[in-house]
């Protein structure tokens, strides 16, 4: 094969890999999770959520979802709620976050999350710090799940608008931390 043809193939492969990369660039594994405080809801009741307080109890699954009561976000919340016994067994807590207001989150915490885990408001600063701006709609968060160890380090990241793998991947990472 002539040298120029080989070069074109390599350039083509490189371009393909770059185009196949995810559009969002989440925090990398090993990064320190940015600390934050915000308001949230659990079982319809408001509360203040502080990342450092959550980490005192063990690893945390912090999952960002675009908008409460949309089909994918509701199905994802129900899947996390169904898996809460396994997350507890692994010693992990779960918190969902979106840019929704507190009144919406109060309803979502009971109807979709089934009173099993809290959801909280992601401020613009938190959305930026966790690099979860939804590129197509910047007022929303991307669907990105983080598993953060009790020292505050990101040990797993999964960013995909399809909600289906988020629960299984975060649970596997939480279980691996327990070993």
How should these model regions be labeled?
Residues 22-32:
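Cleaved targeting-peptide boundary
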């Amino acid at each position: 094969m002539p040298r120029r043809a080989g070069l074109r193939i390599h350039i083509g492969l490189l371009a393909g890999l770059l185009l196949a990369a995810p559009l969002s660039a989440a925090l990398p594994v090993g990064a320190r999770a940015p600390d934050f405080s915000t308001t949230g809801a659990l079982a319809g009741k408001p509360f203040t959520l502080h990342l450092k307080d959550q980490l005192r109890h063990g690893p945390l699954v912090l999952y960002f979802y675009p908008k409460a009561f949309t089909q994918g976000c509701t199905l994802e919340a129900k899947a996390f709620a169904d898996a809460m016994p396994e997350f507890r067994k692994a010693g992990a807590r779960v918190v969902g976050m979106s840019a929704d207001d507190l009144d919406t989150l109060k309803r979502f915490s009971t109807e979709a999350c089934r009173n099993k885990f809290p959801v909280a408001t992601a401020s613009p600063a938190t959305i930026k710090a966790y690099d979860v701006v939804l590129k197509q709609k910047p007022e929303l968060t991307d669907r990105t799940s983080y598993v953060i160890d009790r020292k505050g380090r990101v040990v797993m990241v999964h960013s995909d608008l399809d909600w289906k793998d988020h629960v299984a991947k975060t649970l596997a990472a939480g279980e691996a931390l327990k070993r």
